[in-house]
A protein has these predicted regions:
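N-terminal lobe of the biotin/lipoate ligase/transferase fold
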Residues: 1-149, 153-154
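Short, conserved beta-strand/beta-arch hydrophobic-aromatic motifs that form part
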Residues: 68-73, 154-179
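Hydrophobic transmembrane alpha-helix bundles
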Residues: 81-92, 168-180
Length: 180
């Protein structure tokens, strides 16, 4: 489903763009979609776009992660149907699965100050403000990315930027499969 949007990222308003609601997808399908939209955005053929979806169970390994950070054995992963993907985003390892809302903003930062760290903080701020609407006291932890409720991470963040256009984003645990 595609909708126009006008939203706030931190204290900044995204003037206009598209919101794609993509249902549940394999990670590699969503990654290919991100790459395609990012390329179109870099070429200024489309406006800023935000993709919302869920993934089938998988681990993604960012630039600072490694397979050795996966605690489950190959047999368990296979039996549970959990795939593993290496990615070009920042961060370590992240589990994705049903019950987790994933948001992939594909935004040209040239119109927003070209500050990647501020962008990352702004994405966290959107989640923090959203949690507040549900009376959940979420916040940041010094030295740790993402959004936290106490000592528990409720949203994992990992991004990459190419030609000032963002990819990847943030994954919010709404009602994830706790057995994973």
């Amino acid at each position: 489903m595609k909708n126009n949007f006008r939203t706030v990222i931190g204290d900044e308003v995204i003037k206009s763009g598209y919101c794609l609601q993509s249902g549940i997808r394999e990670y590699n399908q969503a990654y290919e979609l991100q790459q395609h939209i990012s390329l179109l955005r870099q070429q200024m053929l489309i406006t800023d776009t935000v993709i919302f979806l869920e993934h089938y169970p998988c681990f993604t390994i960012g630039r600072h992660g490694g397979f050795n950070h996966i605690l489950a054995g190959n047999e368990v992963l296979r039996d549970e149907g959990i795939s593993i993907y290496e990615t070009d985003r920042g961060g370590d390892i992240t589990y994705h699965g049903p019950g987790q809302l994933v948001c992939y903003p594909i935004i040209d930062l040239k119109g927003y100050g070209r500050d990647v760290h501020r962008y990352a903080r702004n994405i966290e701020e959107v989640v923090i403000r959203t949690m507040k609407k549900f009376s959940i006291d979420a916040g940041r932890r010094e030295g740790y990315p993402g959004v936290w409720v106490g000592k528990e991470k409720i949203a994992a963040e990992g991004i990459t930027v190419s030609r000032w256009v963002t990819m990847h984003g943030i994954a919010l645990n709404v009602c994830p499969l706790l057995k994973h």
